C-alpha cells in the first residue's frame, strides 16, 4: 500500500505541475482560458495575475509532494510522509473548496481531488 500511496501522490503532483503550467505560463492562450471557463481574451488578461499566483501555489504543493516521495524512498519516512500528507491533504482540501463553489466545478474538483485523496487514505492505511 505504501507504493500505491506514493504513486497516487506522484500523479497528484504531476497534475498540479500541469495546472501550474496552465495558470502561470499559458493562461492567456484561448485553449487554456476556455478550460477555466473564461469567456474572453480580455477577461484572461484581467485575471492573468491572479492565475499566475494560483499557479505557483499549485507548483509548491506539487514540489512538497515530490520531495516527500523522495524522502520516503531515501530512508526518511517521517519527513517524507509529513510532506506527502501535508501537500496531498492541502490539494484535497482545495478540491473540496472548489466543489463547494458550485455544481459547475464538481468535475474539476473530482479531477483535482481524487489522486490526493487516494494517496492520503492509502498512506494512512499503510502506516497503521
Stretches found by the model and what they are:
Residues 113-128:
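Small-residue-rich segments of transmembrane alpha-helices in multi-pass membrane proteins
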Residues 2-26:
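N-terminal signal-anchor transmembrane alpha helix
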Residues 25-47:
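Cytosolic, membrane-interface loops and tails of multi-pass inner-membrane proteins
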Residues 42-60:
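Interfacial helix-start motif at the membrane-water boundary
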